[in-house]
């Protein structure tokens, strides 16, 4: 049987994270009451995992094992979203190589807040829900975008002069021209727009709103409260809103604008930390570079749903860097390593090792397929085919 090693992982305490979801899932106390946004599982240089080599006390660097057992071309994350993440997109391979080379040649520090490219890799990703999750992903059809904005103007006609230049581009130009014009709104106009949206009358919404759902209005008002001078508060009008139930997943290719808004889940991506942000964040926003990587075409994300009662399931994607598996019961994990697994329910035994909810482990390459015993459920990430 392949060698298996318990993992010790590092956390990202971004302000959008939850103080409770990850600590409770792992069974640890959050003594400092800090937000736990992400737990990284893998060998990305931004937060590389360690492995327990003998029992639980001695540890080594996962990268050293990977050199022996084969490449680990993906990064596996646990995400806990209390506040909305930025609207963002990730580059394709060519864009990542070009952007990384440019920033390296400019001698821009890797830790600089204006750094966009931390590496030269693309970053397609899949997000799988562990709780109900809300996100936005992909541009709507131009006609649908116009319908949404026209309904906004029915509720708030005073915004017509601010929004008409961008909407005019959508009618006679392209989606990219609309997007650029929307983000060229002056700061004063942005603040004016946000103030009106914050104070919008609920009865007026009920009377005039038929296309925009109550949940979308709540999102927009929430964005206006959190980011009172940000044109990205209007993103629910031009991006698809998606709701996931536990075990459901969406695949987000490079170049697709998206934002995770709330919930708890797992994310697998190509081993990269390249992010281009467009708003809804105090972090660095680079609209010009974001537009360079965006695919300005409508994109409706497909929700991947396992069959009811499935004890194992593969979340297929076109990405060769990773596959995501769900395994439960007494199933044999038939993929060869390397792989990273995280237990989400119950307890399992494999060989002399016991893993409980919240535990993660690395399966090295080589040896026979791994069998798990017990009453458990886990997710496993491994290289694609």
Give the label of every model feature segment.
Residues 308-311, 320-336, 354, 365:
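Conserved short histidine dyad/triad with adjacent acidic residue
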Residues 181-246:
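A charged, amphipathic alpha-helical module
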